[in-house]
Amino acid sequence: MKKLALAVLTACATPPALAPVAPVTWIADTSTYAQTTSQTNAPNAIADRYRGAADRILAAGRDDRGAYQKLAELTDTIGHRLAGSPELDRAIAWAVATMKAEGFAVHTEKVMVPHWVRGAEEGAVVLPNPRAIRLLGLGMSVATPKGGITAPIVVVHNWDQLDAQKAAVKGAIVLFDIAMPAFDAHAPGFDSTGYGKTVGYRSRGAAKAAAYGAVGVLMRSVTARSIATLHTGRLSYTDLAEGVAKIPGAAITTEDAQFLARLAQRGPVTFHLKLDEQTLPDTESANVVADFVGTDKADEIVVIGGHLDSWDVGQGAIDDGAGCVIMMQTIKLLKTLGLQPRRTIRVVLWTNEENGVRGAAAYAEAHKDELAKTVMAVESDTGGAAPTGFSAGAVDKAASKRVVARVAQIASLLQSLQATRTIETEGETDVEPMGPAGVPLVGLMHDVSTYFDYHHSDADTLDKVDPQTLANDVAAMAVLAYVVADLADRIDSP
């Protein structure tokens, strides 16, 4: 799950070579992006001060396969890690043991999380011609009544069509046949993926359809490219009107969504849906916290992290195993190089991002007395492909501009990785709760041109991560973390 307001600037699958000039910085507001290029002779005191350390990190980081080895252990020996599952418990224990063995101070912090369990799932066209339809229940969906639901299908392609057909929706299963736009490398920020244009139907569709009396929903999988792949994701009942019963929801392949839409154009379609999902009482999980303790400013903290949980399909390699191991290997690389910064770099592996975000909320609450001395919080939650730069910002607008400018200076050290882009954004899901306390929020950005081909599906497996690009991610992250943790002043200071 990603924060929809987040603008993630991406590169083409094969980015063009960079000319030997100052980096391009993208500055974004809510809708308009302005390209600014600094002069080649413009002063960059941060880059000048840390170029030697950055070169050491980049040279060592590009050849370091530690992150990939960690990711292979996590995905191949544990696998997917839904909140409340034994697999997530094992992953937490693995992360603690791994970072303790590397010499870091590690502990866990209790978090109570939702406990949703997938059961048997069935889908089929009943009329006009019987045909089985593969499906995948949406996370947090309620179960169907025992024996399932058999009802007519109503196909909609947007919210207006749902409103216009509200009379037909009563007693029906609504199919949200919403095509995710293809990746557009020329579109700014998160618009390049098309995810933001479609994911709202997955999360809010059931509540809206239930308001008109629907008995269930089907969602076209949120992906632009499919080879009959099913993509799950969180279904939310937050918008459900008082007194309206929750209804079940499932994802179907883009191919089957189009098939059902064509059938419905020819005449009535009846569908059978059966989901045996369970929502059990909340259960105990934990955030993992590991400190690479600083020197003379050790009480000040740079938080870097990813979410250790995943959906219950695939291996959770790109979402978000890659983000976790990038951060774990960042402090390992710096320690190996003997680059101990002035401030403490803290790795946080959050629990329950996918279906509750309770780990993020719990961390911000548990550490509220430290947030005034938390100088930056970074998240990586868009896979393990090539790094392209950083999103950055702060709640205070003036401070946000300063943060973006300084992160851009640091990113200029990453020209050899073609990771110099910087945009101003609101922050990603797990770091966002720290924003109101004034913590600068940063995201490690990646090439996401293929990310949503595998996202939340059985195809999210280790083979989708290239060892070299993952090593480059670690190198980019280590440069940012080290410089910010070692600077004389905070990156948001006037």
Predicted regions and their residues:
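Alpha-helical metal-binding/catalytic segments enriched in His/Glu/Asp
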Residues: 99, 201, 209, 288, ...
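Soluble metallo-hydrolase cores and metallopeptidase-like ectodomains found primarily
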Residues: 51-53, 127, 134-136, 140-166, ...
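Noncatalytic luminal/extracellular "stalk/propeptide" segments of secretory-pathway proteins
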Residues: 42-53, 61, 72, 76-187
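His/Asp/Glu-rich mid-to-C-terminal helical/loop segments that flank catalytic regions of hydrolases
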Residues: 332, 336, 452-494
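Metal-dependent peptidase/peptidase-like ectodomains
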Residues: 62, 130-132, 146, 151, ...
